[in-house]
A protein has these predicted regions:
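Membrane-interface junctions at transmembrane-helix termini in multi-pass inner-membrane proteins
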Residues: 134-156
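Signature of the first transmembrane helix
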Residues: 5-66, 100, 130-131, 237-255
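Hydrophobic alpha-helical transmembrane segments
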Residues: 156-170, 178-208
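Short membrane-interface helical motifs at transmembrane helix boundaries
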Residues: 98-121, 327
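N-terminal membrane topogenesis motif
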Residues: 1-23, 79, 83-86, 218-241, ...
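Interfacial transmembrane-helix starts/ends
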Residues: 7, 44, 77-94, 102, ...
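Helix-loop junctions and terminal segments of transmembrane helices
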Residues: 59-74, 282-306
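Interfacial/gating helices of multi-pass transporter permease domains
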Residues: 32-52, 180-186, 225-230, 253-282, ...
Length: 327
């Protein structure tokens, strides 16, 4: 990957990330005035559950696909890259479908026994329906990132945020017009609709690419083994991080209650911290996360071509830039 292409991809993803986060900042202000800090707290309680499920079913496969597609494309093995994409997407969709059914069916257990908040049961059920759509969207993103085409992931990121904000505002207006209580359900519904829109957009774009959807897959078992060999350690890593984050989500409100806060006050304080303060603190990470996403396929390409000196150089340069940016 040329420097120009790398910086262009990083610029596109960074711009999309900045626009999305700015919109998200005002979106959280809107939520704070509509569902309140307690509603944001309930919403923030169930969001890590989605991250945990996607960590188990999709994130590892997504990263593996980006790396494999880039490697096969660099070696001129276009069909191999497309076969990996199709099998990986089907595998992620299958796993996320099982997870969605399980969590939807046992939503009362997760709400009462895990999150210790019975009010989150309906939120968990609706959120569970979004898992397969999120898997499709993430896998299609990995396909385009593997081809080093950052424009599609950047565009869908903005589309997803726009749909989330618009649909939540629309549901809020509907609730007001019909005298229905405004709860955290409108935020979860907005999240579900945004994932649905991103998945539909991804499906349309892939359907227009006839080479991806028409040919026969050769050696599917070998492809599954190749994807699994790379995705398994990545999945375990993301799963461990998600489990730790989920434990934090459960413990913080409980500890706040232990120190004298009421359940409502604990949720409100937790909502202010995770829904409003923390996103502002993590705002600068947009640049580094965009660079890391673009680096994955480019390093995979250089490794496939045997350019190990370039890998060491780009690793040192990137680490230095991130340290300077963080300081």
């Amino acid at each position: 990957m040329s420097k120009e292409r790398f910086f262009k991809g990083t610029f596109l993803l960074t711009s999309a990330g900045l626009i999305s986060r700015i919109m998200g900042f005002f979106y959280r202000i809107f939520l704070s005035h509509t569902i309140g800090a307690e509603g944001i707290g309930l919403y923030q309680l169930v969001v890590p559950l989605q991250h945990l499920v996607l960590a188990m079913t999709t994130f590892g496969i997504q990263t593996a696909l980006s790396r494999l597609i880039s490697s096969h494309t660099a070696l001129g093995e276009k069909k191999e890259a497309q076969d990996c994409f199709r099998i990986g997407t089907f595998l992620a969709l299958f796993l996320s479908g099982i997870a969605a059914w399980s969590i939807f069916t046992f939503s009362d257990f997760f709400a009462v026994q895990i999150l210790k908040e019975p009010a989150t049961e309906s939120l968990i059920r609706l959120l569970a329906l979004s898992f397969p759509f999120a898997s499709v969207h993430l896998c299609v993103n990995s396909y385009y990132l593997g081809l080093k085409k950052a424009s599609f992931p950047a565009a869908t990121q903005i589309l997803e945020q726009l749909v989330r904000i618009f649909s939540t505002c629309l549901l809020w207006q509907i609730c007001l017009s019909r005298n229905i209580a405004v709860t955290a359900m409108i935020a979860v519904a907005g999240s579900f609709l945004s994932e649905l829109a991103a998945a539909l957009c991804s499906f349309i774009c892939i359907s227009l690419n006839s080479s991806v959807s028409s040919h026969h897959i050769e050696k599917p078992v070998q492809k599954i083994s190749e994807i699994g060999h790379m995705a398994l350690p990545l999945t375990l890593n993301r799963l461990l991080l998600s489990v730790l984050a989920a434990i934090e989500v459960v413990l913080i409100p409980q500890c706040l209650r232990m120190y004298g806060l009421s359940p409502s006050e604990a949720l409100s304080l937790y909502g202010v911290f995770t829904g409003m303060a923390l996103p502002c603190i993590l705002f600068p990470s947009t640049v580094t996360s965009s660079a890391s996403v673009i680096l994955m396929p480019s390093v995979a390409e250089m490794q496939a071509l045997g350019h190990h000196k370039k890998i060491r150089y780009i690793t040192r340069t990137t680490c230095t830039a991130c340290i300077l940016l963080g300081s």
